[in-house]
Amino acid sequence: MAFNDLLKQVGGVGRFQRIQVTLVVLPLLLMASHNTLQNFTAAIPPHHCRPPAHANLSKDGGLQAWLPQDTQGRPKSCLRFTSPQERPPFLNGTEANGTGTTEPCTDGWIYDNSTFPSTIVTEWDLVCSHRALRQLGQSLYMAGVLIGAMVFGYLADRLGRRKVLILNYLQTAVSGTCAAFSPNFTVYCTFRLLSGMSLAGIALNCMTLNVEWMPIHTRAYVGTLAGYVYSTGQFLLAGVAYAVPHWRYLQLLVSVPFFAFFVYSWFFIESARWYSTPGRLDLTLKALQKVARINGKQEEGAKLSMEVLRTNLQKELTMSKGQASAMELLRCPALRHLFLCLSLLWFATSFAYYGLVMDLQGFGVSIYLIQVIFGAVDLPAKLVCFLVINSLGRRPAQMASLLLAGICILVNGVIPRDQSIVRTSLAVLGKGCLASSFNCIFLYTGELYPTMIRQTGLGMGSTMARVGSIVSPLVSMTSELYPSLPLFIYGAVPVAASAATALLPETLGQPLPDTVQDLESRRRGKPRRQQQEQQKQMVPLQASVQEKNGL
């Protein structure tokens, strides 16, 4: 398309692209930390009831006299005796005296702070009858991501990618910092919800702003770079959480850097492609000329003019007279087809992904080690995904990553629970495939939707992903019916969803669509022929420049 020619005219992948892409993806390091932060800030340490205030432990026979034990000889977490017992309450799985009555922990709990000195669980006693509140914080965070995906995806198509990114950086910095100083759990949840909203906007606009400034052949590199930065953030979280085990300091440490991101984001250059779609050619020209200067192509930038842009962006200007709305995703057949297929892919990826990564304490090994392993597996997985994306295409990469992830999880469901090494290995492999699926779906979605509704489409896709992340914890409760049932559900959904990829067009080597007409031509299977006909009707860029300058 003509816009890709304009990008080549002002330097292709030059100094500007390298600088802006680096600065835009840098916040993804800490976005990964926020997404799984509650694995550490809401970790549940071993705990037991606090004895009554009037208890005399030296006279009563010690702390154990007040604590009933389970069949493995460990103190029960949520019960204590109403009066001290003369001997251990359980012996070989049976109660020793048979007369000890128990009661809830009315005087609070004593926590083992050796691994987690301070978490929201220990500070606000989110255990026993209040245990469900622990998940509420994560659920509200994910609900915020869902809301943010819809709101900021829509606003980015109306106000531009740069303005929304600036707002998102500031909101994340303020809400994340305030969460660290929360006086109670209600305030904490409120600020976590606001953080989720803004981080959703960052994820969406980071990818789009970068992709819209890159030539066709380099878009996959941008998507892969963003994925690797996110994976590196998982390593970063494990190290930072180990060094800073206090939840308030950890929350503060992953939030304050967004103030710096907010400051330098004012120097971002808005997407010239977005400017051209609403028909603001004067701003498009200024943006392209500024990029040309940064890339050392000042002469080529000076040759651009309003007349050249009108000639080469004729189709975009014609179609921009009517702004697309979110309802177009359902009203237009081509967009509806994309929306339904991509929604299923987004939902399945997130549903299975968060089913694995938000249960790190369930592996029975160091939570820090599992966090590192889960981050490490992303590196080779995303490298393979990148090679497939660039050689075979987006569609086979998306299908294979979902299919393999689902198979790993399904097989995990039939492995005996005492085979911890095999089960953990399968979970790690499945997580790597799902991380690759996320990497691919961001790029694939951005390339499938036309410019005028690209952010709205990405926002709706991310919304479906958040629905998956909210539903995922509910599925884990089915383990009460059958221990492996959650794994069967987590595995079946991505396997079934992978079939939807076959209904989508391939975008490898294809120009970004700007209009619904481009989608219709893809559905007819004639994108390249239509492109050739357009090129015959359109005045070539170089010829226009030469004519303008009397050459």
From Swiss-Prot:
Glycosylation, residue list: 56, 92, 113
Localisation per UniProt entry: Basolateral cell membrane; Basal cell membrane
GO BP: prostaglandin transport
Domain of life of the organism encoding this protein: Eukaryota
UniProt main location, coarse: membrane
Segments in the Cytoplasmic topological domain: 1-23, 157-164, 217-224, 270-337, 390-395, 447-484
Segments traversing the membrane: 24-44, 136-156, 165-187, 196-216, 225-245, 249-269, 338-358, 369-389, 396-416, 426-446, 485-505
Cellular component GO terms, alphabetical: basal plasma membrane; basolateral plasma membrane
Region (Disordered): 520-551
Record InterPro entries: MFS_dom, MFS_sugar_transport-like, MFS_trans_sf, Orgcat_transp/SVOP
Modifications after synthesis and translation: Glycosylated. Glycosylation is necessary for proper targeting of the transporter to the plasma membrane.
Reactions that this protein is recorded to catalyse: (6R)-L-erythro-5,6,7,8-tetrahydrobiopterin(out) + a dicarboxylate(in) = (6R)-L-erythro-5,6,7,8-tetrahydrobiopterin(in) + a dicarboxylate(out); L-erythro-7,8-dihydrobiopterin(out) + a dicarboxylate(in) = L-erythro-7,8-dihydrobiopterin(in) + a dicarboxylate(out); L-sepiapterin(out) + a dicarboxylate(in) = L-sepiapterin(in) + a dicarboxylate(out); prostaglandin F2alpha(out) + a dicarboxylate(in) = prostaglandin F2alpha(in) + a dicarboxylate(out)
Topology in the lipid bilayer: Multi-pass membrane protein
Keyword terms of this UniProt record: Cell membrane, Glycoprotein, Membrane, Transmembrane, Transmembrane helix
Cited Pfam families: Sugar_tr
Stretches in topological domain Extracellular: 45-135, 188-195, 246-248, 359-368, 417-425, 506-551
Domain notes: Multiple cysteine residues are necessary for proper targeting to the plasma membrane.
Stored NCBIfam families: 2A0119
Note: Involved in the renal transport of a variety of drugs with well-known nephrotoxic potential, therefore may play a role in the etiology of the drug-associated nephrotoxicity. Uptakes the diagnostic agent PAH/para-aminohippurate and clinically used drugs. Mediates the bidirectional transport of PAH/para-aminohippurate.
Function statement: Secondary active transporter that functions as a Na(+)-independent organic anion (OA)/dicarboxylate antiporter where the uptake of one molecule of OA into the cell is coupled with an efflux of one molecule of intracellular dicarboxylate such as 2-oxoglutarate or glutarate. Mediates the uptake of OA across the basolateral side of proximal tubule epithelial cells, thereby contributing to the renal elimination of endogenous OA from the systemic circulation into the urine.
Family: Belongs to the major facilitator (TC 2.A.1) superfamily. Organic cation transporter (TC 2.A.1.19) family.
Protein name: Solute carrier family 22 member 6
Source organism of this protein record: Oryctolagus cuniculus
Lineage: Eukaryota, Metazoa, Chordata, Craniata, Vertebrata
